[in-house]
Amino acid sequence: HRFKSNIGKSYQKIAGKSLIEINVIKARKFKQIKKIIIVYNKKDAKRVKSLKLKHVQLVMGGKNRQQSTYNALKCLTNKKSISKVLIHDSARPNFSLKLFHSIIKNMKSARAVVPKIKIQDAVKQIIDSSKEEYILGKKRDNLFLTQTPQAFKLKEIYQLHKSNSAK
């Protein structure tokens, strides 16, 4: 862990609540959220269950983020009442309720909504990794950092993850 703790970032506490709990509390403020799924690492099974989250489905993650997301999406495919999905990194609880509302609102007419931040830092690309002196400065005009939560049409994101998991 980057911040020198044996406890995963999602389980760190702020004002007595884990980052997972903070995210769940925020999500529950929106009536459009019909189901909350927490994907956890196998080694964190006891820790996530100790949170005693009510009305939350726990799903064991996979060997990488893509597989973990796919495991969660599989739980939703038989739910006829769910056509859209929000995917969020539980280690990032500082999204605003205004952003959350905007994502939900924009999903009424979009296939996907992915919040982005313009890159301010200098961006470089190594052209030949065997000779690191060949570094090319990149224009930032078309480069962005993406954030979560991200929203997608369930069928489309499920199919993408399904096809990627087969590779």
PLM region spans:
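N-terminal glycine-rich phosphate-binding loop and ensuing alpha1 helix
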Residues: 1-45
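Residue-level signal for inorganic ion chemistry
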Residues: 20, 72, 89, 118, ...
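Residues at the starts of beta-strands that form the adenosine-phosphate
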Residues: 34-36, 84, 111-112
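Short phosphate-binding loop-to-helix
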Residues: 51-83
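Short beta-strand-to-loop acidic/aromatic patch adjacent to the donor-nucleotide binding site
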Residues: 80-92
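Conserved core of the sugar-phosphate nucleotidyltransferase
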Residues: 94-167
